[in-house]
Every structure is written in C-alpha cells, then in structure tokens.
C-alpha cells in the first residue's frame, strides 16, 4: 500500500482546509495512512511532520507495520504524548499585518472522539493551539480505492461468496439460524478470513422481515424465506453480500416479491456509472419497487461504500448529492420487508469503473428453493 503517498496527499489537503495539523484517532484511518493495525495509537500529521504515537504493548508491531511516520512509544499514553508533541513544536499560523501569530488550528476527528477525550486534549494544549472539527478528509480519500485495494476487495468478495454454498448445505427445516451462521463462520476461518465483516444475519420465516435480523436460536420453519447477509475481512478489507432463499415450494406471490426485488436491484446496478449522484441510485431502486407496488416496504437506503470498514462513503440514500467516481466500491441492496410475513433482500458489491460498473459478487441472484 502507498502509505507515504496517502500521507503526502493529506498534508496537501491540510492547507486547503486551513488546518495546521490533523490528529488521527480512528483505527481504520490510521491503518489507511500508515499501516498500523493495532488498537491503541494516534497519528499526528502537520505540513512537515508525520508522527505516530503508541504505547509499549505495540512497540514491535509499530516498528513492523508503520510506514512513513516517526514512531514514538509513549509511557504516558498516546493522547498525552501527542498533545505534548504539538505543544512543544510551537505550531502557529503566519502573523497578519501588524498583528501577532494566530493560534494554530489542530483538526480532530470529532465523529471518532468522545467528549471526555476532547476535553482532556483541550486541557493539555496551550492557548496557542485551537481544536477544530476536521471535515471527513480521510474518509473521502478512502472512498476511492487504488488498484491494490481493489485486488484486496476482490479476494474478500470471492471468499465471502464461497460461504453461500455452505449456507445452502446447512439450511434445512428445524436447523437453528445460529447453526447456519456458525457453519459459515467456521468455513470462513478455515479459508483464511481474519474475521467476519459484521455479525452474520440469518433471518428465517417471519424474522426475514427484520432488515438486520441477526442469527437467533429460532429454528428454520418448513416454509418461508431465509435472508442470509454476511461478509468476511481478508487482508483488512471487507466483503458484504446478501442472498435470500426459500425453504419449501414458493408460491406465485413469493416468487413475485422476489422477482420485484431482483428487478429493482438490477435496475439500480445498471444505473451505476461515473458522474451519477449516489441518491439517484436509491431513486432508481425505489422507482422500480414503486412500479411493483412494494416501495412502502423498502425501509432502508440502497447501499454504501465498502473497504477497510463495512460501512464507508458514499451513502446511496435518498437525496445524497455525492457523485460516484471511478474506484468507488459500493453495495447495491434493495429489499422488501412485510412485517410478520416475510422479507427479501439481494445485495452485491459493485466497482465503479471509467465507463460504468463491474459487479464483483460472482454468486447467482436467481431464487434458490430448498
């Protein structure tokens, strides 16, 4: 991964956003910028310096993983050490005509910092340094994947997709949802996955109407839909897919609902291309379901970015103005959920290309009856 290049680009962005330094605390952002995969660390980036702070537990790991930044092992903890370093380096903006230097602006990831942590940081800094909420600079950069990241995502998608075969082997009337999830998760680990991307969703019968119906101890009924939503983490990158199967013999109504979701998903995928607004993809999916009379049962957004985290930018939700760009990897996952009856969702990961898009998920979207 080009960690040094990412750091240099961020340094350029700092001046554009009138920041003298950025304090990076969110572990996925730290990993993206310098390669560190541990849970305790802070990366400070200024116009000239890049310094990574961690504690003694991670000395060896930091030396093995961190790229492009000086490593400081902090006995007093990363936050206190980072604050002391900022105070000692006398950051300040250029003085205006006839005036002294203005306080330096230290950008913080406010969405990833607790109020208590921010208060401790502010108390540790001199008055010459002011905290400022930083825009989602790193998250925006992460939304466009380079070739190495895309290769990692392809591998994660392929491994994740292979687990659907294990689900089909396990799903039977009377089998607990948690048993299906356990078989899939064991197969993932055996195949080399670092972890699951999120808690596996196996929702059967009436529970399939729960969009996030994580696997329960409920037994799969003799008749009805089973929603399987799952993903793996491989080399740090996540996969995400959903398939819905039917246990028993699906009625004409059940097939019709499934077909409506399948058509909406295909219409949305067909709309993915550079330059289109993220909200427009959501609109396409809803319009298709509206034509089928099912739009009122589609209760969540159409998709999201995927990468080092399972939910990243962009958000494919109503009214979202962000424009899709080549290199973005997104999910497209419309669903229909009729409370107390059933639910259907189909989800693929999709790469935005220069001329359109590529569906990364290799698994068939046709209805499987068990």
Set out the residue ranges of the language-model regions.
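Active-site neighborhoods and metal-handling regions in enzymes and metal-associated proteins
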Residues: 1-370
């Amino acid at each position: 991964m080009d960690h040094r290049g990412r750091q240099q680009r961020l340094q350029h962005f700092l001046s554009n956003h009138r920041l003298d330094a950025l304090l990076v605390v969110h572990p996925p952002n730290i990993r993206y910028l310098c390669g560190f995969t541990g849970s305790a660390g802070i990366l400070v980036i200024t116009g000239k310096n890049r310094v990574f702070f961690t504690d003694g537990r991670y000395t060896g790991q930091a030396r093995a993983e961190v790229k492009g930044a000086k490593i400081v092992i902090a006995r007093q903890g990363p936050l206190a050490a980072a604050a002391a370093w900022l105070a000692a380096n006398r950051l300040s903006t250029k003085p205006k005509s006839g005036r002294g230097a203005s306080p330096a602006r230290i950008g913080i990831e406010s969405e990833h910092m607790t109020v208590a942590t921010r208060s401790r940081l502010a108390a540790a800094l001199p008055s010459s340094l002011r905290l400022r909420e930083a825009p989602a600079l790193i998250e925006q950069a992460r939304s466009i994947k380079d070739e190495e990241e895309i290769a990692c995502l392809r591998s994660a998608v392929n491994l994740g997709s292979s687990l659907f075969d294990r689900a089909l082997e396990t799903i039977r009337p009377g089998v607990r949802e948690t048993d299906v999830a356990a078989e899939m998760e064991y197969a993932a680990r055996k195949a080399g996955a670092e972890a699951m991307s999120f808690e596996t969703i196996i929702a059967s019968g009436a529970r399939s109407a729960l969009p996030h119906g994580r696997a329960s101890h409920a037994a799969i009924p003799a008749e009805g839909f089973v929603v399987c939503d799952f993903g793996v983490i491989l080399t740090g990158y996540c996969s995400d897919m959903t398939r819905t199967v039917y246990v028993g013999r699906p009625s004409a109504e059940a097939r019709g609902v499934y077909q409506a979701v399948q058509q909406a998903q295909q219409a949305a995928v067909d709309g993915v291309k550079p330059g289109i607004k993220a909200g427009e993809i959501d609109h396409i999916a809803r319009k298709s379901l509206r034509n089928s009379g099912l739009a009122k049962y589609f209760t969540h957004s159409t998709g999201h970015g995927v990468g080092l985290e399972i939910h990243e930018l962009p958000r494919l939700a109503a009214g979202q103005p962000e424009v899709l760009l080549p290199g973005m990897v997104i999910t497209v996952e419309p669903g229909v959920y009729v409370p107390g009856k059933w639910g259907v969702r189909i989800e693929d990961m999709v790469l935005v290309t220069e001329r359109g898009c590529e569906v990364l998920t290799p698994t068939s979207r046709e209805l499987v009856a068990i």
